[in-house]
Curated annotation (Swiss-Prot):
Gene3D superfamilies given in the database record: 3.90.1100.10
Job description of the protein: DNA-dependent RNA polymerase catalyzes the transcription of DNA into RNA using the four ribonucleoside triphosphates as substrates.
Organism expressing this protein natively: Liberibacter africanus (Citrus greening disease)
Catalytic activity, reaction form: RNA(n) + a ribonucleoside 5'-triphosphate = RNA(n+1) + diphosphate
InterPro entries listed in its UniProt record: RNA_pol_bsu_protrusion (IPR007644)
One biological process term in Gene Ontology: DNA-templated transcription
Keywords from the named record: DNA-directed RNA polymerase, Nucleotidyltransferase, Transcription, Transferase
E.C. designation(s): 2.7.7.6
Key word Transferase present: yes
Protein name: DNA-directed RNA polymerase subunit beta
Length: 146
C-alpha cells in the first residue's frame, strides 16, 4: 500500500523557498509579519531623513520634549539642535559571527547658551554660545529579517 502525502510545492517568502507538504495548496501569500515593526522602527528613528526635514515625531519628539534644559539661576540653557547616526561599526554578518548587537552610534548636537544676568535689573544678555556633538550610545538596528 502506498502512502499519499499530497502534492509538494514550494512557497516563496523572505528567507527563500519553503516546501509545503499539505494536501491543499496555499490560497494567499504568506504575509511578511515583521514588516509593520520594521516600518514603525524606521519611522521612529528617521535615519534617512535630513535633520532639518524631520517632523516632530519619534526620536526627534523625544529629544524635543526634554530640551531646553535651563539652569535654576537662569545663567545657562542647553538646547537640542539635532541628532545623527554614524555608520555601523560592524556589518550584519560580522555581528552574527562575533555575537554582537547590530547597532549604530547615536550622537546628538547640543547648544549651550551662557547668559550674563544683571544683578539689579535681572536682564539677560548672551555671554557665550557653544555647540558640541555628544555620543549618547549605540542604537540597535533591525535587519531585513527583523
Amino acid at each position: 500500500m502506498r502512502r499519499n502525502d499530497g502534492e509538494r510545492h514550494c512557497v516563496q517568502w523572505s528567507r527563500g523557498a519553503r516546501k509545503f507538504f499539505g494536501k491543499n495548496p496555499e490560497i494567499i501569500d504568506i504575509p511578511d509579519l515583521i514588516e509593520v515593526q520594521k516600518a514603525s522602527y524606521d519611522q521612529f528613528l528617521m535615519m534617512n531623513t535630513a535633520p532639518e526635514d524631520r517632523p516632530n515625531e519619534g526620536l526627534q519628539a523625544a529629544f524635543k520634549s526634554v530640551f531646553p534644559i535651563k539652569a535654576f539661576s537662569g545663567a545657562a540653557m542647553l538646547e537640542f539642535v539635532s541628532y545623527e547616526f554614524d555608520p555601523p561599526k560592524f556589518d550584519v554578518d560580522d555581528c552574527l559571527r562575533r555575537d554582537l548587537t547590530y547597532a549604530v552610534p547615536l550622537k546628538i548636537i547640543l547648544r549651550l547658551i551662557v547668559f550674563d544676568v544683571d544683578e539689579f535689573t535681572g536682564a539677560k544678555s548672551i555671554k557665550d554660545i557653544k555647540e558640541q556633538s555628544i555620543y549618547m550610545g549605540d542604537v540597535p538596528l533591525m535587519t531585513k529579517d527583523g
